[in-house]
A protein has these predicted regions:
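Thiamine diphosphate
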Residues: 1-129
């Protein structure tokens, strides 16, 4: 994977440097390059999820098993995680997620707009803080 350019490659390097060993995701065009990099790396277990909330449980299980995990999702996926996000605050484990935003300027799908507007408030309410 030579000629690295762009944020997906930079983020991949950060994940590797932080010893992230599991990456969960629902297939997403916004994260396609990052997903491809994770799949190609034998040190990272890429986990295709049925729904984003499974990624919260994946991260918890990884932490309990002595590994670090990350969840990749779209802003609409945050809505799918609302109940499961309580696990993070209650059990106080670290949670790393990277969210591609939908429903912002020039969004072609109006159904994406409400969750886009709610993403940061939901994360703040459920886990106490969100770094955007």
């Amino acid at each position: 994977m030579e000629n690295q350019t762009g944020w997906p490659d930079q983020l991949f390097d950060v994940l590797k440097g932080a010893d992230i060993r599991q990456v969960g995701y629902v297939p997403d065009a916004g994260h396609a390059r990052l997903i491809a990099r994770c799949k190609a790396d034998n040190d990272i277990r890429d986990v295709v999820l049925s729904t984003e909330e499974e990624g919260v449980a994946l991260a918890a299980g990884a932490w309990l098993g002595g590994q670090r995990a990350a969840l990749l999702m779209q802003s609409s996926g945050v809505g799918n995680c609302i109940n499961m996000l309580s696990l993070i605050a209650t059990c106080r484990f670290p949670f790393l997620t990277f969210i591609t935003m939908r429903g912002e300027w020039a969004e072609f799908n109006p159904w994406q707009v409400p969750m886009s507007q709610a993403t940061e408030p939901v994360l703040t309410a459920k886990i106490g803080r969100a770094h955007v």
